[in-house]
Amino acid sequence: MRSMKPPGFSSDLMDEHSVDLLNGSILAAENPSKREVAQDVPGFERKPTKVRKPRVKWTEKETNDLLRGCQIHGVGNWKKILLDERFHFTNRSPNDLKDRFRTILPEDYKKFYPNAKTHMGRPQKIPHTVGLSKSTRKERKQFTPEEDERLLEGFFLHGPCWTRISKDANLGLQNRRSTDLRDRFRNAFPERYAAAGFKLKNNPGNRSKYYQNNMVNDATTPNDSSTTEAAAAAVAAVAAVAASNPNASPQQTTEQPASDELLDWPHHNLPSQFFTSQRNPNYSTDSFLLGQSLSDPFNHTLQSFHPYESLFSAGQPPSLPISPSTSQNSVQPFPFSIQQPPLHLEPPLSSNTLNSSTLPQPNSTDFNTFPPLPSTPRISSEDIPWDNRG
């Protein structure tokens, strides 16, 4: 680039450095910067630069108020300390309170904020203060067995509606939140929680307990197929013994437990018609089924029927005719008699002849009214042509 010499100046009076400076100013005048060009554009508004607020030194009263606020509200609740009307801070922000606490108590700040990577200042000389504590949170209170029972009772009453359970005054769980009740029910009763349709979390303790209970229940509960097979085998064995001894009669036990004793029901207050004593069963030959014991009211009803023989005047019922083809040995008498209910029959007539006086007599004049029958012509044998054929 060829150096430009301004007019009116000789090269003898200026050195090379002065010439270079003069050339730079001329180039800057010919090529203005972008900012200067943008300022000439209409509608351009330059953003105002951020003005930093002046640093105000902390007074002793402000420092004491900060420490008292940390004792009352806990370290970390800077906004609560700032909004507390008992303390006065001059144009301070929550970050200013945190920075001031880090400056005056770096060791305590490191204790409450172990992951802080900010600059730790040197401790300053401050008056003696009482021990500080971090902001208090809700303490975790373990569930008692009584609360678990009431929680389970509330689940039976309201179902998985944890808000209703917490608001139920009869259960006394108002100090527990709905989420606390849900989490406790999931941890204390995982099988009922899963049966209600909820999914268990990936907690190995709950899952192992739940599956262990299910495996124990499956082991103690007999299998349906094995029980059915055992019952079928028992029935087959009893049938085989009965087939081998067809003439053997079952032995009657002298004493059998009553059904009310098995169920542990007292029957001394019940009337006798509501149950049948089974200690000394009375077998009746007049029952419809052989070997069946009937209750007292049913026997009394059967005995109230009239005998079958008393329905006839002769005293003996008419015997049915026996066909010659039927042998005498083929008819087997019944080993028991059946009492039939009374039949309302009318007595038979004294004679088998009909009484003519009871029948209506026909009128002879009625037969004369019929017209006479037409007479048919008779043909002699001589007039028949086919008789003379030979």
From Swiss-Prot:
Keywords: Nucleus, Repeat, Transcription, Transcription regulation. Residues 78-105, 162-189 bind DNA. Residues 50-109, 135-193 form the HTH myb-type domain. One of its GO terms (molecular function) is sequence-specific DNA binding. One of its GO terms (biological process) is regulation of transcription by RNA polymerase II. Residues 244-257, 322-340 have a biased composition (Polar residues). Disruption phenotype: Leads to lethality. Residues 32-48 have a biased composition (Basic and acidic residues). Residues 347-360 have a biased composition (Low complexity). It holds the Pfam family Myb_DNA-binding. Disulfide bonds: none annotated. Residues 30-57, 115-143, 244-278, 316-390 are annotated as: Disordered. One of its GO terms (cellular component) is chromatin. It comes from the Eukaryota. CDD domains: SANT_TRF. It is found in: Nucleus. General transcription factor with prominent roles in controlling histone levels and stability. Binds and regulates the activities of many promoters, including those controlling the expression of all four types of canonical histones. Is also involved in the centromeric loading of cnp1 and maintenance of centromere identity. Moreover, regulates the expression of cdc2, a protease capable of histone clipping. This is Telobox protein 1. It comes from Schizosaccharomyces pombe (strain 972 / ATCC 24843). The lineage of its organism: Eukaryota, Fungi, Dikarya, Ascomycota, Taphrinomycotina. The gene is teb1.
